[in-house]
Amino acid sequence: LLASSLRRKRLRTFFTVASIVIAFLLFGLAESMRYALQSGVDVAGADRLITMHKVSFTQLVPQSYESRIRAIDGVVDVTPQTWFGAWYQDERNQIPTFPVKPEAFLRIYSDYLVPEDQRLAWVADRSGIMIGRGLADITGWKVGEAVPLRSSIWRRTDGTDLWDVTVRAIYDLPQGGDTRQILMHQEYFEEARGMAKGLIGWYVVKVSDVERADVVARQIDLQFANSPAETK
């Protein structure tokens, strides 16, 4: 009887199931962002701002915003970040993973301790990743090791959720910061993903003067006021 009812009301069933899936996805994104804000990757800091969609961090913003943000007086550097939803072997165990621009990321997060040869190797390999010491200890991954990551959110242009990457660098953080994360190349992510091309999750912005951080933040938001993707 239940199956018969579901068949008769396929559209309603589809939207019901879809709403449940979306609800769980949004919950996962919320938990992920909470983790990012509280973890060793301290997204916002004394000289760092986070710029995201005004409505919600689950709404994406255009990559084209980066050049306009860079042009604002007081901005030193910018990198995009997006929640990747990575998992390895067991989907229940999500690994905080963010596509970034490697060189800009390391300039903004200058406290990341990375051997120079590994830093250069990561920057040079578009499918390379940098992982934290804590994650390396948990997984046993070594520099040079190929890792088949999967994403619970992002499928590739070929329709699969498998992202083959190679560990190129392992970073440490001073004072016991959280090092259980993965940083991957924004260019690789943008080229290979099958949806939402040209959009990113949020920007991390480094400012030249901490005392003017609020002023810079307002200038950034004014740049995109009354646009389809206003920021905050």
PLM regions: where:
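N-terminal Sec/SRP start-transfer signal
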Residues: 1-27
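Structured catalytic cores of enzymes that bind and process phosphorylated ligands/cofactors
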Residues: 1-2, 80, 105-109
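Short phosphate-engaging motifs
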Residues: 13, 33, 212-213
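Hydrophobic, regular-secondary-structure patches
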Residues: 21-98, 103-104, 114-125, 137, ...
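Short aromatic/hydrophobic contact patches that present stacked aromatics
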Residues: 50, 128, 202-204
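Mechanotransmission and gating elements of multispan inner-membrane complexes involved in transport
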Residues: 55, 60, 72, 135, ...
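Hydrophobic secondary-structure segments that place a key small or acidic residue at a functional site
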Residues: 81-82, 90-101, 112-188, 196
